[in-house]
Regions:
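Signature for phosphate-centric chemistry
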Residues: 1-12, 16-196, 200-323
Length: 323
C-alpha cells in the first residue's frame, strides 16, 4: 500500500450506490488509512438503478436476469414439521413455512450482530441444514453457474479485471455490464494501480465465480454431499472477500512437485508473474483452469490465467442477457 501510494499517489476504491455498500467502502477506507484516507484515495460511487450500467450491480444491465430456483416448494418440504411445531404457540394468526423461513433468517442476523442468539434454538439441526441448503441452491441457481445468465453477470467485472491485470485500457467492443462513461476515462477507470478495492454484493461475487469457470464451484449442490464446494456460508458469508494477488517473482518458482522430486533444475524456470486467488482468506487453487498447472500452492502464472479466459467474450453469455 505504501509503495502504491508513493508511485501513484492515490488508491482506487469503487462501490455501488446502495447505502450499506457505500458504508462498507467508507469503513474499509478509514480502517486502511485512518481519517486521512480522503487525501490518499480515489473514491468512486456507481449508480445501482435501472438504466445505469455497473459491474457492481450487473442485474440492471441484464434484462433476462431472474431467479430460477423455485424456493417455496423446498421450504414447505423441510420446514413442514417446524411450522406445525411453532403453530401451537401462536394463537390468532397462521404460521406458514415462509414465515418460519423468515424466522430462521432473523436468527442469522441476530447471530452476526450479537455473536449468539437463543432464538436459534427454536430449530433442529436438520432444519438448520435445510436452511443452509436453501441458500446454497438459491445462490447457485439464481446468480451462479446454475443460472443461464450467471456467468454473464460476472463477465463485465472479469473484463475489467483483465484490463487491470494487463494494465491496458478497457475494451469497449466487448462491453457487457460495464459503464462506458466511467471506463472510457483513465482517471475514472485507472489500470496503473497496485491495489484496487471494489465493494459489491454477495450475488455479484457468485456471478464472478461463475464467469471464472472454476470446476469445483460449478457443481450443483446436493443436500447429502457433506463435501460440496458450493456452500454459501463459506463462499459468500456476511462480509465475503474475494482477493487476487499478483506476485512478481525475480527468481524462479517451480511447482512444488518439481522441487520435491528434483526432476527439473531451478535454472530451467525463468522469472515469472503469478496469480493467487483467495476466497475469505482461503486459497482457491487455480489448477482447474485450462492453462494453469496443477500446483500444491494454488498459484497460476499470470499468462496462464489470462490465456484461460481469452475466450470469455466468445461464449455467448451476454446474448442470453438480451433474451
Amino acid at each position: 500500500a505504501e509503495k502504491d501510494f508513493a508511485e501513484n499517489k492515490r488508491l482506487f476504491v469503487r462501490t455501488g450506490s446502495q447505502q450499506r455498500i457505500v458504508d462498507s467502502a467508507l469503513a474499509w477506507s478509514t480502517g486502511f488509512w485512518g481519517n486521512s484516507w480522503v487525501n490518499k484515495t480515489d473514491f468512486e460511487v456507481q449508480i445501482e438503478e435501472p438504466g445505469f450500467n455497473t459491474t457492481l450491480a450487473p442485474n440492471f444491465a441484464c434484462s433476462a436476469a431472474a431467479d430460477s430456483f423455485k424456493i417455496q416448494e423446498w421450504i414447505e418440504s423441510y420446514l413442514g414439521k417446524a411450522t406445525a411445531r411453532l403453530q401451537q404457540y401462536v394463537h390468532g394468526a397462521e404460521i406458514t413455512p415462509m414465515i418460519v423461513y423468515g424466522m430462521q433468517q432473523l436468527c442469522s442476523y441476530d447471530t452476526v450482530a450479537f455473536g449468539r442468539s437463543d432464538f436459534c434454538s427454536l430449530f433442529t439441526e436438520e432444519e438448520w441444514l435445510g436452511f443452509e441448503f436453501t441458500w446454497d441452491k438459491r445462490f447457485f441457481f439464481d446468480y451462479g453457474p446454475g443460472n443461464q445468465v450467471g456467468p454473464a453477470m460476472g463477465l463485465g467485472w472479469l473484463n475489467e479485471f483483465v484490463s487491470r491485470l494487463t494494465r491496458t485500457p478497457w475494451n469497449s467492443t466487448t462491453q457487457t455490464s460495464e459503464n462506458a462513461t466511467f471506463n472510457a476515462h483513465a482517471d475514472l477507470f485507472p489500470v496503473d494501480r497496485a491495489i484496487y478495492a471494489d465493494f459489491t454484493h454477495d450475488s455479484v461475487l457468485t456471478s464472478v465465480l461463475a464467469a471464472l469457470r472454476l470446476p469445483e464451484f460449478s457443481i450443483a449442490p446436493k443436500l447429502d454431499d457433506k463435501h460440496r464446494a458450493f456452500r454459501t456460508s463459506q463462499v459468500v458469508p456476511f462480509g465475503a472477500r474475494m482477493v487476487f494477488e499478483v506476485f512478481d517473482c525475480p527468481t524462479p518458482v517451480p511447482p512444488p512437485s518439481a522441487l520435491e522430486h528434483r526432476r527439473i533444475p531451478l535454472k530451467a524456470y525463468p522469472p515469472e508473474q503469478y496469480l493467487r486467488m483467495k476466497l475469505n482468506d482461503a486459497i482457491v487453487p487455480l489448477s482447474g483452469l485450462s492453462q494453469c498447472e496443477d500446483r500444491k500452492d494454488g498459484l497460476c502464472t499470470l499468462s496462464g490465467f489470462l490465456d484461460s479466459h481469452a475466450d470469455r467474450n466468445n461464449q455467448g453469455w451476454w446474448d442470453r442477457c438480451r433474451g
